[in-house]
Swiss-Prot record:
The lineage of its organism: Eukaryota, Viridiplantae, Streptophyta, Embryophyta, Tracheophyta. This is Protein PLASTID TRANSCRIPTIONALLY ACTIVE 10. Keywords: Chloroplast, Phosphoprotein, Plastid, Transit peptide. GO terms for cellular component: chloroplast; chloroplast nucleoid; chloroplast stroma; plastid-encoded plastid RNA polymerase complex. Residues 272-340 form the S1 motif domain.
């Protein structure tokens, strides 16, 4: 499409110039006066930035970019200690404080802009006298302050004894009682200190007093029982590992090619045991993993900024001495063995502690409180409901009563059909009836719709298998009642069935449930009185908190404010709909509901008819006046519909009411 007929000569930058991306000062050529035909277009919003604009709208923070970044890193709890940036990211960092559409000011930003060109980077690498690979390797060097070497000081020589674990044997494993008693005597000898000088002296002389305190014989008996347990459970543990852990990662059980004979299982270790190991993995957010000769690697919790100094002392492949601080369930916790470094000792460098050891969430975990108690974690605070269970009413509705009622109705329906159509059941026994279709318990409820007195209502179909019914007993019961009814009719008396067999069974279930609820109430009252007498808390500490603990405007699923929108719960029930229609009808007749007592119903009808006639004549007169005004003066305000400002009696039925949130709102 040709917009301008006048030919114009525009000059464009030369694309063959390789330095066209280099920022230069803006050069303005003298304006040329060109006569143009009037054309409709859009002017550019980009104007050169002057100094006053930068003073008004420029960044007013006194902190430099590096200081602001450092403060942000400290507040977040983690910082990139040595940033490894690409040339593009480095230029973006150093040009943040530069203005837009203006030449670069700082020499760092100008140098970073030059480094965007590969030719300039190669030139700088050549000037430094290194290869390109060496230059890239230099970007990954640690450029921060390096601390002095860490020296672990000892109070004296340390003697380690081989002590059997206190939790031996594992659950479900039976051992010889006398051997177990002999093994557990080692725990009594732990209170006696073994000095290195006494041990050397006894070994030279040939005495066994100090050597017996080392519990070597008891530990050998434990090793014998431990090896028997490994032989019987090794294959089972490996199968469970493949079933629960699809992929291997540090801290989990080694299996397949990684497993070697002689690796120690978890029952071999106990908290407080000191081991030698090798660092295998370092993880920024989890910590260090140490191989101590077992099927599980030990986990040293380290995270975040603590690695800034620790990384200089703990490296992959170094030999360390560690102490086991905790042994946990491998099926619930991710890392069963928790360690601490003894040599080199870095306890004084760890500040960011894990709140809780990481755990697994399995498919069968449905109760979060049970998981929390399993892991030894405190309860999650929740709002105090304010209800007292000891003051609530007793329960008397057994949950199985609904199923019994469903079975009872199905039995009576089949018996009714049996009496109405005896030919259909001729030659058949009720106990031998079978389902017409394959019964599926997952699909025993069907939802649909049905009409009742010209009203469409939701319908629920409950399917029951014939195998669950006791039709023979129900038929015998009905025949007995029919016999009694015939006898009473012959005597000229009436007969009324009090309760059927299934009704009596339902009452028994309800009474059983009520009795159980009563016993639970009595047990709860005894527990409350005992806790109050001993000064113990009535609830789990930290489980419930007052409403002020959570602040204001917290989500409450029980409040209608969070179930619907801001307008509240819409009233779409049948009763409220009839009330709205009645109010709208009254308004259409009288106009206001408070004038019913001023006149009779007939007078009100006549008055509304007259008002409607007057309204129609006024409307025709207004149309004539509007047409005349439009001819005289074309004004936008003439299109306004003044009929909406008429009397309230013009408001008709519920169809004319305004809709708010899907609900018809009545206006007074």
């Amino acid at each position: 499409m040709q917009i301008c007929q006048t030919k114009l000569n525009f000059t464009f930058p030369n694309p063959t110039n390789p330095n066209f991306c280099k920022p230069k000062a803006l050069q303005w050529s003298p304006p040329r006066r060109i006569s143009l035909l009037p054309c409709r277009g859009f002017s550019s919003d980009e104007f050169p930035v002057d100094e006053t604009f930068l003073e008004k709208f420029g960044p007013k923070d006194k902190d430099t970019e590096d200081e602001a970044r450092r403060r942000n890193w400290i507040e977040r709890g983690w910082a990139p200690w040595e940033e490894i940036l690409t040339p593009e990211a480095d230029f973006a960092r150093k040009s943040l404080n530069e203005g837009e559409e203006v030449p670069l000011q700082s020499p760092e930003a100008i140098e970073a802009f030059k480094m965007l060109r590969p030719s300039y980077r190669k030139k700088k690498i050549k000037e430094m006298g290194i290869t390109e690979d060496e230059w890239y390797a230099k970007q990954f060097e640690i450029r921060g302050d390096k601390p002095p070497p860490l020296e672990t000081s000892w109070a004296g020589p340390m003697v380690l004894r081989q002590i059997p674990p206190r939790d031996w044997p594992p659950r479900g494993w039976e051992v010889d009682r006398k051997e177990l008693e002999f093994i557990r005597e080692a725990h009594k000898l732990m209170a006696e200190r073994v000095w290195l000088e006494d041990l050397d002296k006894d070994l030279r002389v040939g005495e066994d007093a100090t050597v017996d305190k080392m519990c070597l014989e008891r530990f050998k008996v434990f090793l014998k029982q431990y090896k028997e347990w490994v032989e019987d459970n090794k294959d089972r543990l490996e199968e469970e590992s493949y079933k629960l852990d699809q992929d291997f990662y540090p801290g989990r059980r080694k299996r397949g090619k990684d497993y070697e004979d002689g690796m120690y299982e978890l029952p071999f270790y106990y908290p407080g045991m000191v081991c030698e190991g090798t660092v295998t993995t370092l993880h920024l957010y989890q910590g260090a993993f140490v191989d101590i000769g077992g099927v599980h690697e030990g986990w040293v919790p380290i995270k975040g900024n603590d690695w800034f100094w620790i990384r200089h002392f703990i490296k992959v492949g170094m030999h360390v001495i560690v102490e086991i601080t905790a042994k946990r369930d491998p099926y619930r916790f991710r890392f069963p063995l928790e360690l601490r470094f003894v040599h080199p000792n870095i306890d004084h460098m760890i500040f960011n502690k894990f709140d809780f050891p990481p755990i697994f969430h399995r498919d069968g975990d449905t109760n979060p409180d049970e998981i929390r108690r399993d892991c030894g974690r405190p309860p999650e605070p929740r709002k105090d409901p304010g209800s007292k269970p000891e003051e609530e009413g007793l329960l008397s509705d057994h949950p199985y009563v609904d199923k019994l009622w469903q079975i009872h109705v199905a039995e009576q329906m089949i018996l009714g059909d049996y009496e109405a159509n005896p030919a259909k059941y001729e030659g058949k026994k009720l106990s031998e009836l079978s389902d017409d279709e394959d019964f599926d318990e997952q699909k025993d409820i069907e939802y649909g719709e049905a009409y009742y007195k010209k009203t469409k209502l939701p319908k629920v179909i409950l399917k029951t298998s014939v195998k669950e019914l006791d039709l023979e007993a129900a038929l015998t019961e009905r025949q007995h009642h029919n016999k009694l009814m015939m006898e009473a009719k012959a005597r000229g008396e009436g007969y009324k069935i009090d309760k059927l067999r299934r009704n009596i069974e339902m009452d028994e279930y309800d009474f059983l449930h009520w009795r159980r609820s009563l016993e639970e109430r009595e047990a709860l009252l005894r527990d409350i009185s005992s806790r109050q007498a001993l000064g113990l808390p009535l609830e789990e500490p930290g489980r419930y908190k007052p409403g002020s603990f959570f602040g204001k405007d917290q989500y409450d699923p029980t409040s209608a404010l969070y179930q619907y929108d801001y307008w509240g719960e819409p009233k779409n029930s049948e009763i409220s709909k009839q009330e709205r229609m009645k109010d709208a009808h009254n308004k259409s007749i009288v106009g206001k509901g408070n004038v019913w007592y001023d006149m009779s119903y007939d007078d009100a009808i006549k008055q509304t008819i007259e008002k409607r006639k007057e309204g129609s004549t006024l409307a025709s007169q207004e149309e004539e006046t509007e047409s005349e005004e439009e001819e005289e003066d074309d004004d936008d305000f003439d299109d306004f519909d003044y009929s909406i400002l008429s009397d309230e009696s013009s408001i008709g039925y519920s169809e004319q009411q305004p809709l708010v949130n899907g609900t018809q709102v009545l206006t007074d």
